[in-house]
Structure formats: C-alpha cells, structure tokens
Amino acid sequence: MGSEFVSFKPWLSNDSAFATHISYTSKEEQLTNVTNCTAIENGWVWNIPLWNNMGTGYCYSSDFVDDETAEKEFKKHLGTDDVDLQKIDIRHGRRKNAWVKNVVGVGLSYAFVEPLESTSLASTHLLISKLIEVLQRRKFNLTKFDIDGFNYSATQEITEARNFVSIHYYLSSRCDTPYWKYQTHEREFMHLDDTYPSSYMGITFSSWYKKILYQHSSEHVWDTNDRGVAYILAGMGHKPISEYYLNWFRQEHPDVDKYLDNVYAQWRQYVESISRYVKTLPTSYEFLKEHIYD
C-alpha cells in the first residue's frame, strides 16, 4: 500500500544469516525448552530444539564479514562441514504505518526484528488481538482516531522489541573482533531517536537509553518492569550496587547488614525450594514424548 519502510539498521547491524537443521547426538539431553543464542566472531548463532532435529543458524553483518568467511565460522561452530546451508538476506525494520486504508499489516508484512521466533510470534499475536479490539470497540464504526491509535500502538510494540534486542549488543563486554568492538565501543546510542511517531510526547530512544544510564550509574536502582532491561544487565555481569552508597547507608543505619543478611537468607531459601521442586519434574524430552509426540 506504499507505506514507507523504516530501517532499524542504526540499531541492528546484522543483515545476513545462514540457516540449517542438524541431528541430535543425545536427544534426551539436547532437547530443551529454550532457544539458545551463542555469540561468535561476527554475530550470533541460534539453536532451536525441535522434536526431530535442531534448527540452527548464524546471524551476522556483511559490513564486517563476507559470506564465505561467515560460512566457515558457522561450520566451525557446528563442528562439521556436512551441512546444507540456506542463505537469508535480512532487512530489519517496520512499515511507517501498519494500517493503511483497508489493509492492515501484521507479522512479517509489517515488521522484522532479527530471526527471533518468540518475538515474532508474540508481536503477531499482540497486533491481531489489538486489531480485534479496535474493530469491536464501536462495532466496526471506525474513524481516523482508531486507525491512528492502532498504528501508534503497533509502532510502540515493535520498537520496544527492537530496543530490547539492540541493548543486548551494547551491554556486552565482548570486543575481541572488529564486529564486537563496534557493538560495545564504537556504536553511538546516545543520540538515536525515532522511537515513537509522537516525539512531542518526549518518548524517544535517547530518552529511554538515558533513563537506563541514569538508573545504572546514578540511582543504582534497576527498574524490573522496564521491558526486561534489568535482566539483560544482570546477565551481562552488571550489578545495581554502589559500594559508596552502601557504606554510607551502613554508617547511618548500623543494623543494615543484619537486615540484608535476613533478605539474602529468605531469597536463598526460596531458590533452594524451587530447585528441589524442579528436580521432581520431567525433562522437556520426557514431557513432550509423553504428552505430545507419543
């Protein structure tokens, strides 16, 4: 319908991928319930356990590596040359408007943010739900207000997914190749904007990023409700603790360590109880075999 394509290239460098399927060597152990992502020289490798085999692929940037070298890196990671690879060209981004006239773009017809199955499924489901909600709100009596609202919401959702993915690169500590050095030391995030179409609301990428910087470097408090950023920070080795403020707090409140020890003890007790319970559950392989594929 002629809706302009808005590229996510300033946030996401990867524009190519090799994909394939590989056989299990130990299905009982390798068939897990998560997608594993592993960083290698010029991007990352996904590993999706399926029932009959594992789907895997290498997502990389042609700005830093050519296809032939990327293929060698991927095969080296897999530990075999005996694989049939499919080359995929990637274009991250979204349409300026998901809803144009009487056509609504959902899923890949609207946007794409790296080959992340869960993100694509979640955003597709969410936009379908939002579309149904808009259509039913006034019994199909639609105005430009309804369409603008849907477009704003669609842009918000896919842009937050983009931000969530991009911050993984920026918070990494890896810098052993030109690709990773660019991601962690040379890429400029501070002044990137264009998060939402309504910039007058003050919601931009730079304001979102500055909020993270402020929480991490000034407040030393992480917002666990901010689209999972706190968990990315923790996974990348960051700690929301300032020894300076903690020592000051100890001087003002001598009993603080006693209370902290109590909190830690309760937390450890909770973690141990969860660990004991998990050991009683079937593995992913056992559950799928018994309830789905048997």
Task: Enumerate the language-model features and the residues they cover.
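Generic preference for hydrophobic/aromatic residues in regular secondary structure cores
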Residues: 18, 32-33, 85, 103, ...
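Hydrophobic alpha-helical segments and their boundary regions
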Residues: 32, 82, 224-226
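Generic detector of intrinsically disordered, low-complexity, polar/charged segments
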Residues: 40, 90, 104, 225, ...
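Predominantly flavin-linked oxidoreductase catalytic cores and closely associated redox partners
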Residues: 1-78, 128
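FAD/FMN-dependent oxidoreductases across multiple families
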Residues: 51, 60-172
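Glycine-centered secondary-structure boundary/capping sites
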Residues: 2, 107, 111, 275-276, ...
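Tryptophan-centered motif/residue detector
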Residues: 1, 5, 41-46, 90, ...
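Long, low-complexity C-terminal extensions of enzymes
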Residues: 133-294
